[in-house]
A protein has these predicted regions:
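Substrate-positioning beta->alpha
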Residues: 1-15
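Residues that recognize and position ribonucleotide moieties
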Residues: 2, 34, 72
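Residue-level signal for the nucleotide or nucleotide-sugar donor/cofactor binding architecture
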Residues: 4-7, 36, 88
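Mid/C-terminal beta-alpha module of Rossmann-like enzyme folds, strongest
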Residues: 12-64, 98, 105, 109-110
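Conserved C-terminal active-site "lid" loop/helix of NAD(P)H-dependent oxidoreductases
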Residues: 63-84
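Conserved C-terminal helix/tail region of periplasmic/extracytoplasmic solute-binding proteins
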Residues: 85-86, 91-109
């Protein structure tokens, strides 16, 4: 899978308002070129944030050798060249999402 964090997409939209830096009427793929496996992200979150462990699925992480060739590759060079390539990782994006959900639940007594 590839990741597009909403903060990165929003930043790209704001940057695109500057017509001197971003050519108009072009399409850009706004995504990290990092390939990731949701099972590995969930396992890392469980390990690094034990207070969330009961909220996250306990899934067997497949060895990298079993994942090779299972993902499509994408070329993000055009978007990276215009907007920069400093995208949030899938791990950071999902960690922020889980934290937001837990915080919302606390505030709303869910």
């Amino acid at each position: 899978m590839v990741n597009s964090d909403t903060d990165d997409v929003a930043r790209s939209h704001v940057l695109s308002l500057d017509r001197t830096k971003v050519p108009g009427n072009d399409r850009y793929l706004i995504a990290s070129s990092e390939l990731f496996d949701l099972r590995a992200v969930a396992a890392k979150l469980r390990k690094e944030t034990p207070e969330w462990a009961s909220r996250l699925p306990e899934i067997e992480v497949l060895p990298a050798s079993r994942l090779q060739g299972k993902f499509a590759t994408i070329d993000t060079a055009k978007g990276d060249g215009v907007f920069g390539a400093d995208w949030k990782s899938a791990y950071e994006s999902l960690k922020e999402t889980v934290a937001d959900v837990i915080e919302w639940e606390k505030k709303n007594a869910v």
